[in-house]
Amino acid sequence: MYLKTIKLAGFKSFVDPTLIPIRGSMNAIVGPNGCGKSNVVDAVRWVIGETSAKQLRGQSMSDVIFNGTTSRKPVGKASIELHFDNSEGRIGGEYAKYGEIAIRREVERDGQSNYFINGAHVRRRDVVDVFLGTGLGPRSYAIVEQGMISNLIEAKPEELRVYIEEAAGISKYKERRRETESRMRHTQENLDRVNDIAEELAKQLRHLKRQANAAERYKAYKQEERALGAQFKVLQWKALDHKLSEHDQAINQKNTRREEKQSEQHRIETEIEKMREQLTDVNEKHNAVQKRYYGLGADIARLEQRIKDTQEKIHQWQSELEENENVWEELQNNTAECEAQITELETELEHLKPRSSDIHSAAAEASKELAQAESNMARWQEAWEAFQAETSQTMSQLEVMRTKREHCERQLTDLEKSKQQLQQNLKQLQLDQLLNEIAPLSSQSELLNAELSDSQSKLQSLAETIASRRDANQTTREELQTQRRELQALEARAASLEALQKAALGESDGKISEWLSSQQLKENPRLGQKLVVNPGWEIAVETVLSGFFDAVCVDAALPFLTDLTTVSEGRVTLVEKKSVSASAFDKAPTLASQVKSEWPFQQWLAGIYIADTLDQAKQLQSSLQENESVITKEGLWLGPHWARISKLQDAPQSGFLLREQQLKQLKANILGQQKKCDEQEALLKSGEQQLNQLETDRDTLLQTYQKLNAEATTVQSALSTKQAQLDNAQQQQTRLKIGLNECEQQIEQCQQQLTLIKNKASSLDDSQGLLATRREEMIRERDHYRTQLIELREKAHQKRKEADELEIRLASNEDQLSLLRQTVARDQRQLKQLTERREMLSQYLSEGDKPLEELNEKLQTQLEQRLILETELREVEKELEEANQLLRHLEEKRVSTQKALNEAQAQLEELRMQRQTVSVRQTTIKEQLSENDFDLEQVMAELPEEATIESWQEKLDQLVERIQRMGPINLAAIEEYESVNERKNYLDKQHADLTEALEILKNAIHKIDRETRAKFQETYDQVNQQFQSLFPRIFGGGRATLEMTDTDLLTAGVIVRAQPPGKRNVTIHMLSGGEKALTAVALVFSLFQLNPAPFCILDEVDAPLDDINVGRFCQLVKEMSKEVQFLVISHNKVTIEMADYLMGVTMQEPGVSRIVSVNMQEAIGLVEA
């Protein structure tokens, strides 16, 4: 596996996409300081997973992106890609099958990085995993910088150990161990959660068991309620059946009355139907007469309209005939006028046509003479333009000479002034004064910088102290939160126990509490709280005294005896604080001997012996009197002829004494825990005060630092200003001397040039006089040609004008003649049409009176017929009115009958609706019984004879009251109990699985530790051996070794012991810079010989070495290049000569790096050739 290429784009100074080919095993990068060589090292470190901006010489990850220059804008993204040849398959895992692997990292301005392997988006961890065990990594020994040399050799033992672990390839083991520990931690957390959940589920199971029993009783009551409800519904059904019979009888009566009204209505409707038929006949007769009447009226109207239209036509024909005669006469006159004009125009045209030919010939001759004159004028214009060009050139040269002379004269004046100014400026420069001012400013700046450095060190130390104090405060705060959580848990447990104790003492009984409050006994102690029982006998005491735990302790019971009868519900026991004599029993120890209290209780424990075992109790039972008994620790209570044991887990008094002891212990623990919280709060408060004081000190010191910094900046600015003034003055002095010399030379040159210009200007003045004479001759010639041209143009224009006017007159006469001929033809056609129309109109008028007389006669006949029809129509309308009146009377009678029928029908429908309602209620009851799986007939058969609705309603109410007294019932308690029980079993199984998994993970940790120890020991021995071998080769003698700081191979650090030749044993810190560098090189190469990384980057490692040690260093690198690919950055010629390929980094454009590559073998061959 070896590196093939490095692609950079937008990374630091490599703004343009840049490809760096890595050829062979020895490559060197050279270039001046600041050109970007080390940016290549940063790029490689960054792409293989470096996350610290400080390691990349930046403040944030976005600093690696090109930030722009004076001529280039910043870019938004940086990208680096490394190409590896993996043909040997050294990179294992899923990428072992790839012969070439490309790893790319990109970052944008938001600082978010993206990683790619062979183009696929991956995580940073995937990139780091690729190089695990190969010796490559962002902090591995494969990338060695100049600063890293001293860091490596002076590293802490635990930091130096990391390099040996990387060489051993056990970094993947450590990663696996971290993952395993993380899984163990998560498994343990899961196990703790399972334990907590299981404990909570156990409590839920006990609670749900009680709820499930109540649910069973509730179901039994509900079943009884269901049976009674079914019988009650059957009773209701029977009552509804009786109502149904009554409704059927009433419906039959109403139905008979409705049928009577229907018969009467049918008769009336028959009469109405007959009257309607009669009315229809009369109506048809009326319609027929009316139709004839209105038809005749329409005929009369049409005749009247025809008469009117005929009269209008006759009037129109007469008007048209008169207009026709007027137009005919006008057309006759117009035709005569047009024929006269035609004769006149034909005569004029015969005289104009011969004259047109003569005028056109004269115009052509005038145009020819004009063309000759224009040609003469054009030739003169050409000659004039040539003369003007020659004159212009002479004038231009003369003007140039005048301008040059004026320029030289002004230049001479300016140069003389500049010379005087330069001489004056040289005298004004004050170099000595600036040097005197710079010296004290420089001393003051050095003093302020020293003070700033001291303040900065103090600020750094104070910042570390503040960070440490903050961490301590955070630890205290976390501890306080833990203590508070524990206190809250204790208080919650105590509250729970107090609630149980209050329930056991009857304090939750509202009526009893009210009575005690009324007697001011609410705060009096209870007997159960005043008993102290010897350990082990709590169950026995609870068995005997459980009914007296809630007894109220009073000084005297007598004052309350009268009010005891006012207790409405519940039980109240009062105990007086008096001594009670107890009978002596000597058969065995008594139960009273196991109880202590200042309140009397012996009367309730009199005659009760105790026995440790059941056998002892049996022995005592045979000798017991009637008022004696014996009880065991387990609560088995035996009398002479009886035995009792109480296991009422649900009873409030169960476990009362144990809970009381636990409650007392919890209260003591709460006080202790509260004290711990107070101590932690005080400690946190003290830490916060210290932190505030430290921050105040830091702010004060920061103000001092800022003040010093501002003062130093001011002094440095003044120093820079004075230094710049000095540099400027020195540069100005040099420039003034050079300028003075140049000014004198320019004055001499300018004087010589002015003499030449004056001579040439005199020659041009002579030429200008000759040109003026020639100009006057050409102007006289131009005036002659211009006068001749004007005369000929006027003549040609006059001839063309006469020809045009004659042509226009001829064309106008011909057009007018054609138009007149067309007008005469059109008028003759109109005269013919008017004659034909006049004859037709005369014929219409002669025949128009006959149709008008016929129409008037027909109109008179139809008017007489309309009068007859009017009389007949009035008679028919009278007959129709009489029929309608009779029909209305019958309709009114039918409406009254219909109203009575509707009332009867409504009453019938009301009865039917009532019957339907009863029937629906019956059906509903039957359906309800069916839905509840009851059969009506069966329930009716089983129903007792004495059953009534009232008695069954009373039974149901009583049963419902019993159910209500049970209070809220969790019907799902049975299923919840089974579900929680199933979950509890599952959690028990999960607990076993987690315990097994935890054991497996612990075994895996032990195995990883064994492998790590073995691998580390083996690697350590080999590296130590190689280090002891390489050190003398590099130093030319001496010895060195590695030592472990501890015997534990998992945590032991590694230190370096080195003794250069000729020196006694010294610590590594006493070596010189060159000796440290050589020692570090020996150690790095020892690691490489054991586990060679794919490539090694050496960044100016040879800088602190002299020539002899550089030679040794190069010889060693040359030998190792047979196994390892090297990329060396150096300024040393010896190191550079060793490389096979050279790559130069240049910065021709400020802030932008570029690569130039040279093959050394080819270059040497070219030189030798």
UniProtKB/Swiss-Prot annotation:
Keywords: ATP-binding, Coiled coil, Cytoplasm, DNA-binding, Nucleotide-binding. The keyword DNA-binding applies. GO terms for cellular component: chromosome; cytoplasm. GO terms for biological process: chromosome condensation; chromosome segregation; DNA replication; sister chromatid cohesion. Residues 170-507, 659-1030 form a coiled coil. ATP binds at residues 32-39. The keyword Lipid metabolism does not apply. InterPro entries: P-loop_NTPase, RecF/RecN/SMC_N, SMC, SMC_hinge, SMC_hinge_sf, SMC_prok. It comes from the Bacteria. SMART domains: SMC_hinge. GO terms for molecular function: ATP binding; ATP hydrolysis activity; DNA binding. It is found in: Cytoplasm. Contains large globular domains required for ATP hydrolysis at each terminus and a third globular domain forming a flexible hinge near the middle of the molecule. These domains are separated by coiled-coil structures. Homodimer. NCBIfam families: SMC_prok_B. Required for chromosome condensation and partitioning. HAMAP family: Smc_prok. Belongs to the SMC family. This is Chromosome partition protein Smc. The gene is smc.
